[in-house]
Amino acid sequence: MTTGKLILLRHGQSEWNASNQFTGWVDVNLTEKGEAEAKRGGELLKAQGVLPSVVYTSLLRRAIRTANIALNAADRHWIPVVRDWRLNERHYGALQGLNKAETKEKYGDEQFMAWRRSYGTPPPELEDSSEFSQANDPRYANLDVVPRTECLKDVVERFVPYFKEEILPRVKNGETVLIAAHGNSLRALVKHLDNISDADIAELNIPTGIPLVYELDEAGTVLNPGGTYLDPEAAAAGAAAVAAQGAK
């Protein structure tokens, strides 16, 4: 039986992760801690012999740099890299740039969690005149419509079809594929891989910088539901930290 591997790696801590701001499509960089997390992720891949033959990432530098740093640490810096906007983080609309704790205090827990974790409730749209808008960003010039806001359902609808068409066939063929992306684009994919309900996906948190490995057979069936973190203890602590965002 042919078995392929799918490695999911959320980018290391970004500048706005550190300052507790909604980031979305704003192209912020990694912090020094984020760079170290990305390196550690690559070292885990090398140490456990999970070596990708290709990497897919977004058009945002925090994911691109995470991929590059991790691949360098794993001695896989030479493999092909595919960048696509459909792996981008969820667009957080008018929340982009806002502090999470201040937003929670202003709008209340229920509205805050609906925007942040519900499956189908997008935040208010971002105006094209905002400094955080991507309306005139050249990397999205070929899109018919540049998103002004998204909910997780929107991310599923843009990313999962791309995954099925472009990435899944390689995994089914026995390749090991690395996806270096974002909290919500990876949540969208895990929802699909593990058949998580629209309600239950609200409870899923993806930690930064810790590889999550799925094994799939040639039919595309997941052989280890839920995946396997290469550092389970660090993953549990990291997921708890993500869940706590907005509380401080």
Curated annotation (Swiss-Prot):
Gene3D superfamilies attached to this UniProt entry: Phosphoglycerate mutase-like (3.40.50.1240)
Task: List the PROSITE patterns hit by this protein, alphabetically.
Answer: PG_MUTASE (PS00175)
A single GO molecular function term of this UniProt record: phosphoglycerate mutase activity
**Keywords associated with the record:** Gluconeogenesis, Glycolysis, Isomerase
> Catalytic activity, per the record?
(2R)-2-phosphoglycerate = (2R)-3-phosphoglycerate
Cross-referenced Pfam families? His_Phos_1
The catalytic activity of this protein is classed by the Enzyme Commission as: 5.4.2.11
Site (Transition state stabilizer) residue list: H182
Q: Which SUPFAM superfamilies match?
A: Phosphoglycerate mutase-like
InterPro entries, per this entry? His_Pase_superF_clade-1, His_PPase_superfam, PG/BPGM_mutase_AS, Phosphogly_mut1
Pathway listed: Carbohydrate degradation; glycolysis; pyruvate from D-glyceraldehyde 3-phosphate: step 3/5
Q: Name one GO biological process term.
A: glycolytic process
Q: Does the keyword Cell inner membrane apply?
A: no
Q: Which residues form the active site?
A: H11, E89
Q: In which residues is substrate bound? A: 10-17, 23-24, 62, 89-92, 100, 116-117, 183-184
According to its UniProt entry, the function of this protein is described as: Catalyzes the interconversion of 2-phosphoglycerate and 3-phosphoglycerate.
Protein family membership: Belongs to the phosphoglycerate mutase family. BPG-dependent PGAM subfamily.
Its name, as the record gives it, is 2,3-bisphosphoglycerate-dependent phosphoglycerate mutase
